[in-house]
Amino acid sequence: MADLLGIVAIVFFYVLILVVGIWAGRKSKSSKELESEAGAATEEVMLAGRNIGTLVGIFTMTATWVGGAYINGTAEALYNGGLLGCQAPVGYAISLVMGGLLFAKKMREEGYITMLDPFQHKYGQRIGGLMYVPALLGETFWTAAILSALGATLSVILGIDMNASVTLSACIAVFYTFTGGYYAVAYTDVVQLFCIFVGLWVCVPAAMVHDGAKDISRNAGDWIGEIGGFKETSLWIDCMLLLVFGGIPWQVYFQRVLSSKTAHGAQTLSFVAGVGCILMAIPPALIGAIARNTDWRMTDYSPWNNGTKVESIPPDKRNMVVPLVFQYLTPRWVAFIGLGAVSAAVMSSADSSVLSAASMFAHNIWKLTIRPHASEKEVIIVMRIAIICVGIMATIMALTIQSIYGLWYLCADLVYVILFPQLLCVVYMPRSNTYGSLAGYAVGLVLRLIGGEPLVSLPAFFHYPMYTDGVQYFPFRTTAMLSSMATIYIVSIQSEKLFKSGRLSPEWDVMGCVVNIPIDHVPLPSDVSFAVSSETLNMKAPNGTPAPVHPNQQPSDENTLLHPYSDQSYYSTNSN
């Protein structure tokens, strides 16, 4: 039977978040204020007009990473493998720091709108669309995974239907994201992070004083855990590198970086948010340690609802460590506060992922690939439709797919294996080209898929060294990533040499990126595509070659120079 008091508490929390989201959305400038600035309306919705201060940026960056899966996963990992098995908090914290060092300043200085802009700027629109596939899958499955975690938590503590709780949470997050854009997402993240921090810390001491909970300091060796032998250490390192570098190429990260007022602020929020992720992992880690050192026979917990009690949580129930601690080791009112914390964590991540996927579709797919002449109003409408569609897809997946965590895990692998080397090369390797990018994409994808994924019942078509009992202990993910990066470099350099030396005829340059550059890739003052082609975002032809500048063209600032919407009024009157 549903707990009415708990439902009232959750409804109050949801109403609070909704009100804050609507209020924050009103901070956006009106359409009249934005008419004089080319591209300003799009930036206002997608990036809050690049007006997010460092403090708010730190809060929203931290809140996005500290989602429901982060909290539940940290507690579960510590319960199963101890502190050494709890890699996500440390991995994601280092990931934020590395992102700040490698990409935050460079990407913000270039004035990009999304993570995919440098790909379309250098390789062309179609490559940007190809990079969108793993990015979209990752964001959507991530949203579905955290919604599923919330539904399971609400069903355990409140006894309400999982479908109803997931649908309601998704609708609220989608609604304020739809109406308020990035402003709503950023400011609700501030409230949600506060709720997460307070809610979890209220629950920890309450759980510690339960009669069944033992003093965790007396059994430190038990909850610290161990990695294992050489094979296990190899797998541990592979997974840690996946978290560190695979956590960078996500639009949710770059949305915060690119919305910062300055490039220095973008770096600062990355560094400080990394520390914030570590601090926010302490409460769920303690919850996992408490659960690991609890004699569950001294509680009312019966995993099979038949009166049978167990000393420890069964393996198939350990993904519910956090809600079980709330339910059986804390007073009722404390459990409701903890539930609010988990709900806040889920919504702070879900809204960000939905907006990120929708922004990439509207800007990189619709505007730069499908409809290059689309107005800003049309792009914003498309983005809002995409917000609804992504929200619906994630909700359906959360309700229907049993192995949603497995799908998200596989997508996270693909982001690490495919997108990270691509992003590193497009930013730091001036001679990389479309041929290298395509070859690297294919190599990374194949090497990862042949390794299999048990979580989604994908068999291993190739047994890497140390393959034992269905487990790939060899660091094949990192091997695939490095192979992809090496392929990008080698194919790019060799293709350039072959074409420029004359060994290959220019007609064979079918991608038009070395010597056979199509006429529509060269900016012409009489062509509207001059204002919107991704190859002219920085007034350069593909692969960084300086492009001719029209004598009547006015100088542009840092952002408008790179902006596909800049000076459309000029081209609309001079393109006939």
Swiss-Prot record:
Question: Membrane topology type, per the record?
Answer: Multi-pass membrane protein
* Record's keyword annotation contains Transport: yes
Which terms in the GO cellular component ontology are assigned? axon; neuron projection; neuronal cell body; plasma membrane; synapse; synaptic vesicle
* Tissue and organ expression note: Detected in the nervous system, including the nerve ring and cholinergic motor neurons of the ventral nerve cord.
- What are the Polar residues biased-composition ranges? 566-576
- Tell me yes or no: is Nucleus among this UniProt entry's keywords: no
> Which terms does the UniProt entry file under GO BP?
acetylcholine biosynthetic process; choline transport
UniProt keyword annotations, A-Z:
Glycoprotein, Ion transport, Membrane, Neurotransmitter biosynthesis, Sodium, Sodium transport, Symport, Transmembrane, Transmembrane helix, Transport
Q: Where are the transmembrane segments?
A: 6-26, 52-72, 83-103, 127-147, 166-186, 193-213, 234-254, 271-291, 320-340, 379-399, 409-429, 438-458, 479-499
Residue intervals on the Cytoplasmic side: 27-51, 104-126, 187-192, 255-270, 341-378, 430-437, 500-576
Task: Give GO terms: molecular function aspect only.
Answer: choline transmembrane transporter activity; choline:sodium symporter activity
Question: Can you say where in the cell this protein is located?
Answer: Membrane
> One short Pfam family name for this protein?
SSF
- Report the InterPro entries cross-referenced here: Choline_transporter (IPR052244), Na/Glc_symporter_sf (IPR038377), Na/solute_symporter (IPR001734)
Q: Would you list which residues are glycosylated?
A: N306
Taken from the record's topology, the Extracellular segments are: 73-82, 148-165, 214-233, 292-319, 400-408, 459-478
User: Where do the segments described as Disordered lie?
Assistant: 541-576
Function according to Swiss-Prot or TrEMBL? Imports choline from the extracellular space to the neuron with high affinity. Choline uptake is the rate-limiting step in acetylcholine synthesis. Sodium ion and chloride ion dependent.
Indicate the family of this protein. Answer: Belongs to the sodium:solute symporter (SSF) (TC 2.A.21) family.
Indicate what this protein is called per its UniProt record: High-affinity choline transporter 1
Q: Which organism is it from?
A: Caenorhabditis elegans
Its taxonomic placement starts with: Eukaryota, Metazoa, Ecdysozoa, Nematoda, Chromadorea
